[in-house]
């Protein structure tokens, strides 16, 4: 996949890219990509292989440890995660991303308002992260367009053919 090789190339040169003042004015921080396709098509495996090839840890986000029913706690958890990831140089892997990056709704009650605030906060943190963020989903249409507009690479993982499965 050429798209995956583009990710590897970015990782190889990310320090130079992130430290170049001229480039900083022209391009977004970090690299964001979306892996989408049916279950079992290699999205998680590909994220792991990207990490292995680049000698980087892939941190799979456990949504149960991030999302909280208490107001403001989800944002605190996300802040801790992103601060730690910056220091550790992790690849952040959001599996089943549609559950956290879903389309925002019109505000009907306070619950909708807080959900939309969480989405906006997450959008800002991802935008400011100078490393690699991979979102993986089986439900691409459910991802908020504000996220998809900021993604540099969108990679489809189709069901492999019989011949591809033998490889």
Model-predicted segments: where are they?
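Walker A/P-loop NTP-binding motif of AAA+ ATPase domains
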Residues: 2-167
């Amino acid at each position: 996949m050429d798209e995956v090789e583009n990710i590897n190339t970015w990782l190889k040169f990310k320090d130079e890219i992130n430290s170049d003042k001229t480039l900083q004015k022209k391009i977004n921080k970090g690299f964001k990509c979306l892996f989408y396709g049916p279950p079992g098509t290699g999205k998680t495996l590909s994220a792991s292989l990207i990490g292995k090839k680049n000698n980087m840890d892939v941190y799979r986000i456990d949504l149960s440890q991030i999302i909280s029913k208490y107001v403001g706690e989800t944002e605190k958890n996300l802040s801790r995660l992103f601060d730690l990831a910056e220091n550790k140089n992790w690849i952040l892997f959001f599996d089943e991303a549609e559950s956290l990056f879903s389309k925002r709704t019109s505000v009907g009650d306070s619950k909708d308002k807080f959900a939309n605030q969480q989405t906006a906060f997450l959008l800002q943190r991802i935008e400011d992260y100078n490393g690699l963020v991979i979102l993986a989903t089986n439900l691409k249409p459910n991802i908020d367009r504000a996220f998809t507009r900021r993604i540099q690479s969108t990679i489809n993982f189709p069901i492999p053919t019989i011949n591809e499965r033998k490889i």
